[in-house]
Amino acid sequence: MAPPVDGGGARYFGVYPALVTDIVDQDGLGRVQVRFPWLGTDGDRDVRAWATLCSPYADDQQGLEILPEVDSQVVVAFEAGDLRRPYILGAAWNGTTTLPHSPEAANNIRILRSRSDSRLEFDDTAGSAKVSLTMASGHQIILEDAPPQITIQHANGCVLRMTPAGSIEINANVSLDVTAPTVNVTAPVSTFSGIVQCSTLITDAFVVSPAYTPGVGNIW
């Protein structure tokens, strides 16, 4: 691509820091407005431009959309060195902003954390890998390798867990409601520790009970 004709103005090659000033592109092009503090901020020297945001996946009505926060620091480069054509290559922590997780030598943690403290975390610890999705309220989904299980937990303590033994445990604080036109249970034995109550019971074979009064056709 031929460089823009701009009267032979200065060219800026390499990468430069910039500060985000606006993320709502009125032209609908998905650009982000940035300011270049290193060019000065006095009067006419407050230089700003709408920058194209680079993404690992961008296509028509699809892609990865994660916009930087206003006032956050980003790293930009300029097409053919033209100050009017900036591209945001990524964001940067700069000392005033801190990482969402303190680094460790083992480098096992990968994390995506939002402003409201919602987190998607990958733990690559050898022998006990884990993926977790959590919210500040306490809701969480955890996939673990050690023990190999999956847990879905509500902030109020209700839990759905798929265990290493192959069982599924559901713990509800109040009730467990199932609504469907038909519910089919296929099992050699179904065990209930308390009272089983129903409006109509139809059996195809026998009812074994210390106290039972059958109706016509073995309908209760």
Task: Go through each PLM region and give its residues.
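A short macromolecule-binding patch
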Residues: 41-51
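Short, structured beta-strand/loop micro-motifs enriched in basic residues and often containing a Trp
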Residues: 50-60
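Short aromatic-glycine-enriched beta-strand elements
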Residues: 27-35
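Right-handed beta-helix
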Residues: 17, 65-72, 78-220
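Alpha-helix capping and helix-loop boundary segments enriched in small/acidic/polar residues
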Residues: 7, 59-63
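Acidic-leg catalytic submotif of subtilisin-like serine proteases
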Residues: 20, 36-38
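Short boundary/loop segments of OB/S1/cold-shock single-stranded nucleic-acid-binding domains
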Residues: 1-19
